[in-house]
Amino acid sequence: MRIAVKRMCGAAAALAVACMASGVTAHPPSVSRVPQQVGELEDVITMRLEGSVVVDPAGKVVSHTLDTKLDENLAGLVRKAVAAWTFTPPVIDGNPATVRSKMWITLAGRELASGYEVRIDNVNFYNPPDPKNAAAPDKPRIQLTSIKPSPKYPKYNVNGGITLLVRFSPDGEVADVAATQCSLYFAGGRATDKVAACQAMISNATSAVRKWRATVPAELARAPGGLTGTLPFQYIGLQGAELVAASGEPGQWRRESRTRYAEPAWRDDGTQRVGSSDVADGALRTASTPLRLNAGAIGKVL
């Protein structure tokens, strides 16, 4: 399921929200009041990479692949970093296990006088359906059943995205929702207007999502973190839409002005961090994975 929300409010068609506007510079509306809950934005370049990893019962990396085509120097640095990762020994159904998983790696570069310093910004682990085994039963997942009202487009002409951490109740109502991060893509304008644009995007999406509903399988309702997922929203303008789409592809750099990632107090310990820099679509991302990276991997300079 996908959602397409135009500026005047469009029809539901996907669990992605694309809010349409014109322009890519954060311009203030007629009355501008910047709420305090959004802090200063940092300017970075980001890139998403696809790959896979095999982790043994001791938490060591047995093998790994990097599927995204990269400059060989950068690819070599990423492979070296992944090979050195260590994990909390993985457990499945109470037993030590070897785990094979797909992964998304997010790189972030910050400009220095001598160039860009690139770090591993985040890693997400997931297992997509096997297209070669169509007969395999679908894994239980949360299904959105009502996605109204649609978020209103803010009074700023921007391209950007936010991520909301959503916790459902077993009966499918939204129990908690909190914004975790906001990114503006290739945005100009004053810093205060960028902050206000992020605040408006967050406020509008949060207000709408509180009224949404879902079907929650009983199996997930009993599982740690099973009621929680990250819901990305994208606000894409008529100007710059192609650039934003292209820069969201794996292996491409995207310029962002973003808030710091923030977690609500109610976040489940097992929930994966998924921020606005980690996504290029609007799919609901749930928390389930037996892999837990040990400290030191995230934030490591390549």
Q: Which residues does each PLM region occupy?
A:
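Bacterial N-terminal signal peptides that target proteins for export
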Residues: 2-12
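Charge-biased low-complexity segments
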Residues: 2-3, 23-302
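N-terminal signal peptide c-region/cleavage motif recognized by signal peptidases
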Residues: 18-22
